[in-house]
């Protein structure tokens, strides 16, 4: 009944940086060619939402509708959309996959260039405009997803169709944090059995790295965090040892080198802190150690180390969305979840509603939650 019509619904709008979100009645325009309008049922909060709200994102535009880790049902589709239809269960993905660009054709990457020129500036490709407005004022999109809304419009290349049996209040997490951690291990680092792994930052992504490392057969999984309370939870995800840098006089990389007979085989930085990125590289074993940057640093920051670290055989890499090609591989991750081969439920510590979104951001900042899932229509 709503097809082709403007839908008015509730959404949490970020009017300016560092201010609480406000629940507004938002008009959501119908999808244009190659666009999909989705009824979002559940969305989770990720640190990237807080990072952009905090004004640290070079691509952050205001006012906008944040949110990028979600699940829902297709409400309608624009002209030319063939891969999904109304009623399909889907996960929107900020990491598009068109299947045609040189990135998509390469097995070496999951980055897709098709809609990046639009999603990077908060609009849609078809007309370089937004599909959201409040009282006639346009509201920018965020990461091509904008899931803190009861309805959103996304490019068709950014929609993964998933198994209808999957519980949407759980698999919404497969839109960002969990695949990012698992894929950093499986796709980017390609951790082998028997490896020693170090993980800096034990939030959702760090724990997903631990889970991925455990399933890859790592022999030691060392968790590093300045909050010692995180160790108990981390054990459930595969972390075998814990170090709090605050408990040591020596630099953390030296502490790790001493504990591992020269360093780790793989390290993962899951914080977005450039000085920690250096420690993560330098705790790697000479000759073969690989460090993967997973965390997103604030705009304008630079990484540094001595070239000798790389000359003597260490490798520095980065990853986005764990190297997973979204439309082809998110459905596979959902199947793995349904077969109980990967954890998802265990990352969810809080369940709130969209109306309580500012409370959810507070929990995130206090470090009291892993993932908080919001019921968008309650």
From Swiss-Prot:
Question: PROSITE patterns in the record, alphabetically?
Answer: ADH_ZINC
**Which UniProt key words apply to this protein?**
Acetylation, Cytoplasm, Metal-binding, NAD, Oxidoreductase, Zinc
Superkingdom, natural source: Eukaryota
Q: Which cofactor does it need?
A: Zn(2+)
Binding-site residues, Zn(2+) 1: 46, 68-69, 176
Which amino acid positions bind NAD(+), per UniProt?
Answer: 47, 201-206, 225, 230, 294-296, 319-321, 371
Please give a single GO biological process term from the UniProt record.
formaldehyde catabolic process
Q: Which residues bind an alcohol?
A: 48, 68
> One GO cellular component from the entry?
cytosol
Annotated positions binding Zn(2+) 2? 98, 101, 104, 112
Q: Which reaction does it catalyse?
A: a primary alcohol + NAD(+) = an aldehyde + NADH + H(+); a secondary alcohol + NAD(+) = a ketone + NADH + H(+); S-(hydroxymethyl)glutathione + NADP(+) = S-formylglutathione + NADPH + H(+); S-(hydroxymethyl)glutathione + NAD(+) = S-formylglutathione + NADH + H(+)
N-acetylalanine: which positions carry it?
1
Segments forming a coiled coil: none
* EC number assigned by the record: 1.1.1.1, 1.1.1.-, 1.1.1.284
Q: What is its main location?
A: cytoplasm
Sample GO molecular function, one term: S-(hydroxymethyl)glutathione dehydrogenase (NAD+) activity
**What remark does the entry make about the cofactor?**
Binds 2 Zn(2+) ions per subunit.
Q: Which family does it belong to?
A: Belongs to the zinc-containing alcohol dehydrogenase family. Class-III subfamily.
Q: How does it assemble?
A: Homodimer.
Q: What is this protein called?
A: Alcohol dehydrogenase class-3
